Amino acid sequence: LPQSPGVPPVNSAAELERCVRELGFIGCNLNPDPSGGHWTSPTLTDRHWYPLYEKMVELDVPAMVHVSSSCNSNFHATGAHYLNADTTAFMQFLTADLFKDFPALRFIIPHGGGAVPFHWGRYRGLAQDLKRPLLEDLIKNNVFFDTCVYHQPGIDLLLKVVPLDNVLFGSEMVGAVRGID
C-alpha cells in the first residue's frame, strides 16, 4: 500500500480497493512504521487504522504486516527492524480489543512472528496477567504466521508452539538473506 509518515491510512483504502477489484490482488502489505525505524505511527490497534481495516474486511483480504527499510542506524533492516516489527505487532494485538471491533479482520505476521514463538510462554503469561483471552483464542481467526524463518529448527519451533491452523507456508524473495542450512 502507498504509505508515508504522517499520512492517514484512509488514503490507502482507495488504492487497496483498486488493486483488489481491478488487478485481482488477494491481500496487501501493511507497514506499521512508514517512518523507517522511528515508529511515529499509532499502534496497529489504534482507531487511526480503522478506515483501512473497514476496507480490508469489506474486500475480504488480509494484510501482511511488514515494515520496509530502516533509516535508523540502531535497527538493521533485515536483522532487527523486521523482527522487531513482527514481535511488536503481535504484542499490540495481544493488548487490545481490535478483533472485537473487526472479527473478520486478518493479519499475517511474517518471519514466523519474529520472537513470538520463542517467547510463547511469556506472551501466554502476559495474556493471563492482563486478563486477556488465551493466545489460541486471541489469534484463532485473525492472526497467522508464515514459515519464513530460514532454518528447520525455527520452523519446528513455530509448528510446535503456534496452533497449526495459524501457520501458513512462506518463503523469502531470492537474495534477502543468503546462507546454507
Predicted segments, located by residue:
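A short acidic, amphipathic alpha-helical/loop segment
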Residues: E15, L52, L98, D156-L158
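H/E-rich (His + Asp/Glu) clusters that bind or coordinate divalent metals
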Residues: N74-T95, F102, R106-D181
